[in-house]
Regions:
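Glycine- (often His-adjacent) and acidic-residue-rich active-site loop
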Residues: 47, 79-131
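Charged catalytic carboxylate motif
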Residues: 54, 58, 125, 132
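Hydrophobic core positions within the conserved protein kinase catalytic domain
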Residues: 63, 130-133
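A short, small-residue-rich loop immediately preceding and capping a beta-strand
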Residues: 137-140
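Solvent-exposed polar/charged
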Residues: 68, 134-135
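Conserved CoA-thioester-binding segment of acyl-CoA-metabolizing enzymes
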Residues: 1-83
């Protein structure tokens, strides 16, 4: 018996979001029919679901999609787990301090000003995500 409360057979990945790496985005199924509930989950359990700029970008994208979808009535925001390192669970431990530089949070190694949106470089846009959640016209 698994301690994982996520039952994959009850959820279906949302189409168009197959490229997500730091977030998972699913739609609730009941008897094969899609339900008005979506599940947005942090997917970095190895670091207690700490977020980085890429995570925030994906989180904003999924939450905005849920906000704009008229057939979505509820957004469940959670964290995946457990950690493969130690079996621990977490919703989200905050910003990933391993990638925080002197000027703030940095994008992944190998990216440059030419490959990153300049408006997002060097900092997390978590405040925009918080605002999106706060003013979401649906329960989160």
């Amino acid at each position: 018996v698994s301690d994982n409360p996520f039952k994959p057979e009850l959820w279906q990945p949302v189409e168009g979001f197959e490229d997500l790496t730091d977030i998972t985005y699913h739609r609730r199924l009941d008897g094969g029919a899609l339900q008005p509930t979506v599940r947005v989950a942090f997917n970095r359990p190895e670091v207690r679901n700490a977020f980085r700029p890429h995570t925030v970008d994906e989180l904003y994208r999924t939450l905005d999609h849920a906000r704009m979808s008229p057939d979505v009535g509820v957004v469940l925001l959670t964290g995946n787990g457990p950690s493969a390192k130690d079996g621990g669970w977490a919703f989200c431990s905050g910003g990933d301090q391993r990638i925080r530089g002197r000027t703030g949070y940095q994008y992944a190694a190998g990216e440059s000003a030419e490959t990153v949106d300049p408006a997002r470089a060097g900092r997390l846009h978590i405040l925009e995500v918080q605002r999106l959640i706060r003013f979401m016209p649906k329960p989160v």
